[in-house]
């Protein structure tokens, strides 16, 4: 299931980026800044889920290089989002409230809740039985909700 999770997260990242740039052509900078920022969520998730060495069969030093590269990409996306937001989005308070109540944000909130439930099964919290399969299934559902969040970005 973890390889499927990684694929869903990478597709969500690509969807966020493609839709963000398509929306820029239509609506300008407000959704471009938002899309660049939220595209980091599934990308970070993919990095978290990917068992680099086991999946790719590479050395620990190469794994470190990939993690550093992924970190640089995240920093670049966040910096670009911040630059676009600070330079081109006005009024900022209105934009922030729009971001917080945007349908994409609502999907992200739901994904976070489902991901939290998966952690309860992983750790056996709240008197829940430990279950790796339920944890993985709930994570896949959460990541699919992130993919849907990218789809509703408009």
Predicted region positions:
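Non-cytosolic membrane-interface motifs at loop->transmembrane helix junctions
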Residues: 1-3, 57-69, 127-138
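Hydrophobic cores of alpha-helical transmembrane segments in multi-pass inner/ER membrane proteins
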Residues: 5-18, 71-87, 139-154
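Cytoplasmic membrane-interface regions of multi-pass membrane proteins
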Residues: 19-26, 85-97
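Juxtamembrane "helix-exit" motif on the non-cytosolic side of transmembrane helices
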Residues: 21, 50-59, 88-90, 119-129
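Membrane-interfacial loop-to-transmembrane alpha-helix junctions, especially the N-terminal start
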Residues: 27-40, 100-111
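C-terminal halves and exits of single transmembrane alpha-helices
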Residues: 35, 41-59, 74-86
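Membrane-helix boundary/juxtamembrane motif in polytopic membrane proteins
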Residues: 88-112, 134
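C-terminal transmembrane-bundle signature of multipass membrane proteins
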Residues: 113-125, 131-154
């Amino acid at each position: 299931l973890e390889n499927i999770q990684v694929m869903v997260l990478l597709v969500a990242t690509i969807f966020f980026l493609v839709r963000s740039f398509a929306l820029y052509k239509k609506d300008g900078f407000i959704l471009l800044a938002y899309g660049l920022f939220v595209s980091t969520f599934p990308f970070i998730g993919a990095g978290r889920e990917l068992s680099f060495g086991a999946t790719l069969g590479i050395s620990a030093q190469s794994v470190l290089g990939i993690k550093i590269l992924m970190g640089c990409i995240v920093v670049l996306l966040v910096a670009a989002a911040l630059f676009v937001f600070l330079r081109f989005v006005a009024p900022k308070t209105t934009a922030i409230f729009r971001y917080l109540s945007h349908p994409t944000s609502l999907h992200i909130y739901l994904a976070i809740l489902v991901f939290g439930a998966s952690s309860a099964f992983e750790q056996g919290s709240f008197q829940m039985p430990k279950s790796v399969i339920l944890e993985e299934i709930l994570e896949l559902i959460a990541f699919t909700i992130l993919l849907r969040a990218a789809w509703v970005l408009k």
